[in-house]
């Protein structure tokens, strides 16, 4: 059996909307939303048939509040959040649990191609291990319990421009 489907693909294109190409818009929506929807559609019949399993999406703090120069990124993460909420309702009686993790800035290669990054102090970003711990809490929850949504935030939101 499949215990969990973890949807964790994502990329960021941060700019004012008019500075982004149509190809940029499609890329962000395809990676951040469509890839999750397509793989989930592929696995859902199996999970429902076995009557158990977790579907976990990596959302973002950007799924909770729009931000300047984040229009398409925020839209893609809002889409994931709405998708997870609707899917949770669709799967309610099947034994399949649906959750979303909304991390803030995570110190990962996500920022490699962006012109900003979290501040250097440890409290300016969460670590990948923090997100992994939240994920394990979700999938190890007692059967019948759904941790619908978890936000994982740095203690202090400090951003710095790259030189």
Report residues per predicted region.
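Substrate-binding pocket helix/loop in short-chain dehydrogenase/reductase
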Residues: 16-17, 24-26
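Residue(s) in the substrate-gating loop at a strand-loop-helix junction
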Residues: 60
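Active-site helix of classical SDR
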Residues: 40, 76
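Active-site loop immediately N-terminal to the catalytic Tyr-X3-Lys motif
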Residues: 18, 65-71
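Active-site-adjacent segment of SDR/Rossmann-fold oxidoreductases
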Residues: 65, 86-96
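C-terminal helical subdomain
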Residues: 100, 118-160
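Conserved NAD(P)H cofactor-binding loop of Rossmann-fold oxidoreductase domains
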Residues: 8-13
């Amino acid at each position: 059996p499949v215990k969990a489907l973890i949807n964790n693909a994502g990329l960021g294109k941060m700019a004012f909307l008019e500075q982004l190409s149509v190809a940029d818009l499609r890329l962000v929506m395809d990676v951040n939303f469509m890839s999750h929807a397509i793989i989930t559609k592929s696995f859902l019949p199996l999970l429902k048939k076995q009557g158990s399993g977790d579907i976990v999406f990596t959302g973002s703090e950007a799924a909770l509040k729009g931000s300047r120069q984040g229009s398409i990124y925020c839209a893609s993460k809002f889409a994931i959040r709405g998708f997870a909420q609707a899917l949770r309702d669709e799967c309610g009686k099947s034994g399949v649990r649906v959750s979303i993790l909304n991390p803030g800035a995570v110190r990962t290669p996500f920022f490699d191609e962006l012109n900003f990054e979290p501040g250097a102090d440890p409290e300016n970003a969460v670590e990948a291990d923090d997100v992994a711990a939240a994920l394990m809490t979700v999938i190890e929850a007692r059967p019948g319990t759904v941790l619908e949504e978890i936000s994982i935030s740095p203690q202090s939101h400090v951003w710095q421009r790259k030189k």
